[in-house]
Amino acid sequence: MENPFASREKGFGNYSDFPTEQMDGLSSNFGSGVRNLISDDMFNPSSELMNFDSLAAWCNSPSATDILFAQYGLSNSQPMPFGAFTSFHVADPKATSLTRSFYDLESSYYGEERSSAQEMNSQFHRSSDSDELSGKRRKVVNQKIGFPNVLNCTIPRSLSHSLDEKMLKALSLFMESSGSGEGILAQVWTPIKTGDQYLLSTCDQAYLLDPRFSQYREVSRRFTFAAEANQCSFPGLPGRVFISGVPEWTSNVMYYKTDEYLRMKHAIDNEVRGSIAIPILEASGTSCCAVMELVTSKEKPNFDMEMDSVCRALQAVNLRTAAIPRPQYLSSSQRDALAEIQDVLRTVCHAHKLPLALAWIPCRKDQSIRVSGQKSGENCILCIEETACYVNDMEMEGFVHACLEHCLREKEGIVGKAFISNQPFFSSDVKAYDISEYPIVQHARKYGLNAAVAIKLRSTYTGEDDYILELFLPVSMKGSLEQQLLLDSLSGTMQRICRTLRTVSEVGSTKKEGTKPGFRSSDMSNFPQTTSSENFQTISLDSEFNSTRSMFSGMSSDKENSITVSQGTLEQDVSKARTPEKKKSTTEKNVSLSALQQHFSGSLKDAAKSLGGETSAYFQAWVYFFCPTTLKRICRQHGIMRWPSRKINKVNRSLRKIQTVLDSVQGVEGGLKFDSATGEFIAVRPFIQEIDTQKGLSSLDNDAHARRSQEDMPDDTSFKLQEAKSVDNAIKLEEDTTMNQARPGSFMEVNASGQPWAWMAKESGLNGSEGIKSVCNLSSVEISDGMDPTIRCSGSIVEPNQSMSCSISDSSNGSGAVLRGSSSTSMEDWNQMRTHNSNSSESGSTTLIVKASYREDTVRFKFEPSVGCPQLYKEVGKRFKLQDGSFQLKYLDDEEEWVMLVTDSDLQECLEILHGMGKHSVKFLVRDLSAPLGSSGGSNGYLGTGL
């Protein structure tokens, strides 16, 4: 059918006069249904239709106003000012016919009988004096508040006509409350029926105009938008608001994509910045009947003032808009749970430099009141609980304010996805969402937010009430590896500080022997709703599954080829659903401890390959070989935090270092021997014997089960000597009865920054036969692991010399802090001394080939290890143009894991690994630091350290 509000204005053109991209946002299949909304027969004597756009009170086009006066015989000798908002009051017979034509239009559209001209004219005050008419017109022209007198007539009108009249009055009141209205365009979008479809159009509707937006108003009149859900893919801003019934705004339309704001090009050309669309509802109804759109010429942080003015104006005409649900009264248990959530979010934000963390609560709408505890359902919405949120970066407060004004539904954003799946959900870039998937994405783009993770928790305080925590990673962290490391660290921090918060587990999951509360990996494709509080998994520090990688196990992701987490290890997911992972989960559950023990003597890789083959053959299905990461996860489930053979290799390397030192001791005939059974040095043999692998495994395995170390398998890069010696944690030097007793003497200060153990005697009056004039230079790794530096000699305790100094790499606290003491022996001195040592070939002094990668760039150069770790950082920084202290290096070790390189001791360890592998080249990964290195010993902060 023809649009009943078709314009009769000449000079405004029709759809054929404009490019097709300006028409509307409907799909191509609706093109045939869209009629020409502007007719060419404006001079048709049988119809004197004139819409609101023709009224001088609301239209600012000079040509249109001239036509208006000419058509109805009005004098246009005195030009109408267009620089301000004006009103045109009906005051003469011909003007009355203009008004009558509008009501004729309304009556015709809704099937009412048209009133006769005589009946219409009798209801208006007319003047036969042309001078009086002219004077009244001049008087009205100078007024700023525009609301025509036609609204005072008493002709019966239809409901739709009443809505138009109300919107005119509401715009008038809005202009009064907002001042001059400078820099504002306000226009109303109402549904019209075109064929079998309803479209939103602002043509022939009331509007409020600033002159600078006249062209944009003309463009808007030529657009139509979908008024029904699923009618088209791109409903545009008015369409989205009409369908959802929720206000939507942006401080700048540039934060929209082109298909989200279909008039983007025209908005840019006309300097449109801020925009808000407000749904209009009848006072007694809940369905949206119109949309009011406001655009501004200035970028606005929010539309609070405009929203308040519009609400008051609508209330005055018995209309309303959708209100933001206010929170219900919180019980004491809810306040306790929210207080703990805020403490957790505050700690996490400070420790890991997160910009902000939000807490969402599922609610239902009950007369504009949020009622928490609502389960998944049709009326469920997710609302921000402001009292539990924490903003670490004050610039992000505007984003929190925007979230407060907009509730999310199920499946919207990572919060909605985490809510329905009971699984943590991760997005590497929330800005990439479409506005239909994440309704506040325009605000996320404004503040530059990137990666975020959401997790659903419950509290023992509130039973089955759900809380969804949304954590935003630092905006500068865009690399997948950086995000992986931070998520692992986040997991450990949250497990340590959460007291009553619990994650929701899958209903019906069977508890296996040895299973403790914690985050477990499970099938991501099916997560039924939890029905009992017993189906919780407590985040507990003393849990057997408190690995820093288990927090986000089984986490889902938003895109293909994006980062996903499986038991804490981020991997590149080549498919959203991989059938082999289900088989892998079943296979993992059937690897027993006895099966693992049979492979302890071999390497981790060989054991993974062997166990995978055996298991798949047992099940006679889908040949699968475990990767080392999978086997590590299985070991942790059995309480094995480190593969035993690697411990033995570490012990042997350390003992070889000790043997090098002992062989250089003067005055001990035949050298010293370290007895692994007693933990003592015995001067009976000229060499030290490596620990037998099988014998060492039996003792270390029992010790490992008893200790239940808190460290992850790949993170444990330190060697604890006390695992291979007696309980007293001391080194005993048992001298032979023929040896002289040690006499007091002076000791030379030595460098302990991770170099091989050295015994050095200072020049003094005592010769070698008089006693041992040396000092034990303890490795920084052993000291940081809590080893007692006290040295026992012949049953008497000898404290280390007070002048002794060392460089300690505090890798145990995860901060990578370097605490350096004074040292009189440098790396160069040690290298000079090493050249005279018979065992110098073990460490090697050949040139090292370095291959470093930073983001998309890779460099290769030769490096002399003797210059030390600081020089290596300088060489890498010089090639990538990075400042000192702004990046960190990690090298690929013999188990293909990335290990931090911070100090010279780390470099020496790297060289030894390369020597054992027979290689002379090393790969380095360069990663940016979000904060300078350094923290207190007890800090759990994420300050650039990795696994």
Curated annotation (Swiss-Prot):
Subcellular location: Nucleus
Protein's job: Probable transcription factor.
Compositionally biased intervals (Polar residues): 522-533, 550-572
Keywords: Coiled coil, DNA-binding, Nucleus, Transcription, Transcription regulation
Protein name per its UniProtKB record: Protein NLP8
Occurrences of domain RWP-RK (ranges): 577-671
GO terms, biological process: regulation of DNA-templated transcription
Biased composition (Basic and acidic residues): 126-135, 573-587
A Pfam family the protein falls into: PB1
GO cellular component: nucleus
PB1 domain location: 847-929
Coiled coil: 646-666
Signal peptide, first to last residue: none
Segments of this protein annotated with the region Disordered: 114-135, 509-533, 550-591, 805-828
Lineage: Eukaryota, Viridiplantae, Streptophyta, Embryophyta, Tracheophyta
Biased composition (Low complexity): 805-815
One Gene Ontology term of the molecular function aspect: DNA-binding transcription factor activity
